[in-house]
């Protein structure tokens, strides 16, 4: 458990992590507006894996604008990110990928909480949720908490075969739900 200054450092890192996402999206939009890239037809988010300060979907979904959204929570950052892309690119299909199972059952319990929040946000914003946790083929039963398993190199991050497995699943889901 983290206490005192360690917790403060973790919270600041979480805040920085969410703000990095915001900066990347703002940079992407600026590059599209400058003509460096075409407007996207599809935008895929992979959300929740590194988040600790979850917030709630209920709080993140308050109001119609993004003015009051707390981007320092996973829920608020996700809403801000998704809605910003939808506002700038109304013809774009947005997909949100959930975290995958890890080799650590406790981490997976936290991932399930994140997925419940992401599912509620996706429903409210009418975007497709891609359930990598339940359907990509990576299961905690074949992974190690902090070592190499079937598809995870360290209990958390997919190795090359794991990346390929996830990629095929995500591509199939996009193909099956793109209209």
Model feature map: region roles:
Residues 49-50, 81-115:
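Active-site segments of SGNH/GDSL-like serine hydrolases
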Residues 99-179:
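Catalytic His-Asp segment of secreted/periplasmic serine-dependent ester chemistry enzymes
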